[in-house]
Structures are given as C-alpha cells and as structure tokens.
Design a protein with these regions (language model features):
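Alpha-helical support elements that line or immediately flank enzyme active sites
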Residues: 81-91
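A short interface-forming secondary-structure element
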Residues: 72-74
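Short, local alpha-helical segments
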Residues: 65-67, 83
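Short Cys/His-based metal-binding microdomains
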Residues: 77-79
Length: 140
C-alpha cells in the first residue's frame, strides 16, 4: 500500500470517532499494535531528541524498503509513533522523503496535543525522514 493510501485510511478511521477522548483511546490501542523495538536497540542513539517522553526508533533496510520498530514509555506517544510507523514502514526511502504529512492536520492531531507533545510529533517525523535520507544515500 502506498503512503497516501495509508494516510487516507487513517483519516477515515479517525473520522469514525465523535470526540477526542475516543480518538485518544484509539491511539492508545494503536500503540498496543506497534512493532516493538528489540531491547538491544533501546539505546541513547535511538532515542528521538525533542520528545518529552522517551521514544526509541530503529530502522533497517529490507529489500530496498525501510522497516521501523519503536517503543515509548508513554501510552499516547506510543500511539503517535505507531501511526507514523504505520505510514512509513515498508516504504522505499525516496517515498518517505517525498511524503507530506498533511493527514496529521486532517485528523486534527497537532491541535489536540500539548505544545511539548506537538514538538515531539515534529521530531518523530523529522527522525523517520532522516533515516530515509541516510538509507537513500546508501542505495545511490
């Protein structure tokens, strides 16, 4: 599935909920489905800087596609990174680099996060795209 298709699917899923309490519960549930990072990768090198909570992300290239695993010590943050990994994992680095993240505004996520969590969201997106740039360089 292409990035835009996954983003549209997420927007559709979020539109099923009437209020933000239900959406937060949905994000918490998504966090429970997150492909968890192996304990050996829970290092300072893999912590996303700029997040209030601890968020670890590991990336590896599998058949020219990036596969992400992650974890967080906070349930909402775990849900946020789960959404991002759902969008970007198993995609080619070039597609990740080129992808926009307008779907985040469409679901209203940024406006319903505290300023520190919103900054963390931006940091997560930035880090996933930096991984894509690094791996794209290796492919070239």
């Amino acid at each position: 599935m292409k990035i835009k298709e996954i983003q549209t699917e997420i927007v559709d899923e979020f539109s099923m909920f009437e209020d933000w309490m239900q959406r937060y519960e949905f994000m918490i549930d998504l966090g429970k489905t997150l492909p968890l990072i192996d304990e050996q990768f829970k290092t300072d090198d893999n912590i996303i800087k700029g997040c209030q909570s601890k968020v670890w992300v590991h990336a590896e290239l599998v058949e020219d596609k990036l596969v992400f695993t992650a974890d967080s010590d906070a349930i909402i943050t775990k849900g946020i990174i789960a959404i991002l990994i759902r969008v970007f994992s198993n995609q080619k680095p070039a597609a990740i680099i080129e992808a926009n993240t307008d779907f985040i505004d469409e679901i209203g996520l940024k406006e319903h996060l505290s300023p520190t969590r919103a900054n963390g969201l931006v940091s997560m997106i930035k880090q996933l795209k930096l991984y894509a740039v690094a791996y794209q360089t290796q492919l070239n």
